[in-house]
Amino acid sequence: MSETAKKVIVGMSGGVDSSVSAWLLQQQGYQVEGLFMKNWEEDDGEEYCTAAADLADAQAVCDKLGIELHTVNFAAEYWNNVFELFLAEYKAGRTPNPDILCNKEIKFKAFLEFAAEDLGADYIATGHYVRRADVDGKSRLLRGLDSNKDQSYFLYTLSHEQIAQSLFPVGELEKPQVRKIAEDLGLVTAKKKDSTGICFIGERKFREFLGRYLPAQPGKIITVDGDEIGEHQGLMYHTLGQRKGLGIGGTKEGTEEPWYVVDKDVENNILVVAQGHEHPRLMSVGLIAQQLHWVDREPFTGTMRCTVKTRYRQTDIPCTVKALDDDRIEVIFDEPVAAVTPGQSAVFYNGEVCLGGGIIEQRLPLPV
């Protein structure tokens, strides 16, 4: 069997990126089929309608391209392996990134296994803006060509074996090119806006949604000087560096500068705020990360120079990484960084190559 005759199952979301991915693979000679994943049991009419519309769009694209669309329900896997951990992290006062966990447990585990075992796939494909390259017998994860859309931050948990079984057709393109292809093909997804919100759950009102599963616990908002200036409705609704939604204005003691969350005292249910986006309490000189995943699956020892992102769309930060033990590292930034948030991921790069990353366990504050 030639390489181009191999079977690829494309994860069809009902969006433009997966739609164009399917067409690109057809042009490359692959045998292409689609798979629509249902990963959440809708509990309200609006959400049901959104999921139904996405499935209808995915079906319309597959019909247009002349490919078969399969469907599968991964709701149980999503609940057990993604959502329960997501809730536990919020309950502990941390700010998790469910999209990263969703990619790890659903798109590149449950989907990959289902496609290979049940559908006979040689590869899976997704509409992620990343690239792969084979170096020294291992598949590497590279940033997407479109730096504005690069999604390697969300895929750092993939192993080189998973990357070797995955294709990322739009990773070699820029977003406007993808939309142009969809328009030229007359695909219904050509002008569909990009999805946002929690992975697979959609654009819900986050506060209301989280409140269904975790009871809110109101508490004090205090300044770094210890003055009580307001009440929060639950620490889980707030993250370090947050400015909007605090419900506090200027105070007699403060200036007119906006307030930012600089700390969360989980034990006492207190939200700590300060004025100014570069307040010293908001700055970190480094971090400790755990739950490490390296793409090449080689254990990291010693030290290395590289760059790091502590959140999506952040400019790369030059840093020095030092191994503390098998599953913990210390990262020291060249310059202090604002709003390093426990629970989020620190993802490391060597140029275009994504090396891997880990969960931020703690930030190393600026010495005072």
Curated annotation (Swiss-Prot):
Q: Which annotated residues bind ATP?
A: G11, M12, S13, G14, G15, V16, D17, S18, M37, G127
Q: Where is the active site?
A: C102, C199
Catalysed conversion reaction: S-sulfanyl-L-cysteinyl-[protein] + uridine(34) in tRNA + AH2 + ATP = 2-thiouridine(34) in tRNA + L-cysteinyl-[protein] + A + AMP + diphosphate + H(+)
| GO terms, biological process | tRNA wobble position uridine thiolation
| Enzyme kind, highest EC tier | transferase
Q: Which CDD domains match?
A: MnmA_TRMU-like
Q: Which Pfam families match?
A: tRNA_Me_trans, tRNA_Me_trans_C, tRNA_Me_trans_M
According to the UniProt record, where is the region Interaction with tRNA?
149-151, 311-312
Top-level lineage group: Bacteria
Q: Name one GO molecular function term.
A: tRNA binding
**Residue numbers marked as site, Interaction with tRNA:** H128, Q344
Question: Which keywords does UniProt give here?
Answer: ATP-binding, Cytoplasm, Disulfide bond, Nucleotide-binding, RNA-binding, Transferase, tRNA processing, tRNA-binding
Cite the InterPro entries for this sequence: MnmA-like (IPR004506), MnmA-like_C (IPR046885), MnmA-like_central (IPR046884), MnmA-like_central_sf (IPR023382), Rossmann-like_a/b/a_fold (IPR014729)
As for subcellular location, the record says: Cytoplasm
Identify the EC number(s): 2.8.1.13
Q: Any one cellular component term from GO for this entry? A: cytoplasm
Tell me the function of this protein.
Catalyzes the 2-thiolation of uridine at the wobble position (U34) of tRNA(Lys), tRNA(Glu) and tRNA(Gln), leading to the formation of s(2)U34, the first step of tRNA-mnm(5)s(2)U34 synthesis. Sulfur is provided by IscS, via a sulfur-relay system. Binds ATP and its substrate tRNAs.
- Quote the protein name from its UniProt record: tRNA-specific 2-thiouridylase MnmA
Q: Which organism is it from?
A: Shigella boydii serotype 18 (strain CDC 3083-94 / BS512)
Q: Which lineage do the record's taxonomy fields give for this organism?
A: Bacteria, Pseudomonadati, Pseudomonadota, Gammaproteobacteria, Enterobacterales
The gene for this chain is: mnmA
